[in-house]
Amino acid sequence: MDPTRGLCALSTHDLAKFHSLPPARKAAGKRAHLRCYSKLLSLKSWEQLASFLSLPPGPTFTDFRLFFEVTLGRRIADCVVVALQPYPRCYIVEFKTAMSNTANPQSVTRKAQRLEGTAQLCDCANFLRTSCPPVLGSQGLEVLAALVFKNQRSLRTLQVEFPALGQKTLPTSTTGLLNLLSRWQDGALRARLDRPRPTAQGHRPRTHVGPKPSQLTARVPRSARAGRAGGRKGQVGAVGQVCPGAQK
């Protein structure tokens, strides 16, 4: 383990303070990650995706693929974006979330997130470069890394950094990269993210089960019921009188 990289670069005091974060804080961070994934899947255009990730200005890609929690060696990349058209490019994205609305660079948590996030991105890129099937005669794919700090509630970008990678190309084909990422991403998580969520408009209206309209009777006022009761008594006295034309 390189003592100058990742959490190893923190002092003993800062490292102990970072590891002492309450479980509720860590759980909130995990939930924010899942919301980031769902948000990315809901975006329909590259402009929307680039805005959410605060990517630098560049070409407008017309087709791209998303992969989540991809196991790359001993690291897990939060998200890998593979842009396909007009030319292939790979973005490795690491999310770090905060409860505050500012990414205070002096806080122990921010320093730890920055150090660990940068190490994660570099390790993921190195693993991809050595593990993807090489293609002879191919110029390879350009690879970039993005460390994105988000607010846990609003998912607003607080800060974004683009760590420098040792090599900026992956010596492989687009097909080879997509196949590997499909196998290495968390399939159960992806299935859960892809599952359609019921909406208020999608619910079927409740069907009221009750008597048919022909079976409904109107409420009769008390005075009218009294009058009808008297009429019924008179009819009882007339039992035995057969009306002409009546059939049994």
Swiss-Prot record:
Residues 194-248 are annotated as: Disordered. Keywords: Host cytoplasm, Host Golgi apparatus, Host nucleus, Late protein, Virion. GO terms for cellular component: host cell Golgi apparatus; host cell nucleolus; virion component. It is found in: Virion; Host cytoplasm; Host nucleus, Host nucleolus; Host Golgi apparatus. It comes from the Viruses. Residues 218-227 have a biased composition (Low complexity). Belongs to the herpesviridae UL24 family. This is Protein UL24 homolog. It comes from Epstein-Barr virus (strain B95-8) (HHV-4).
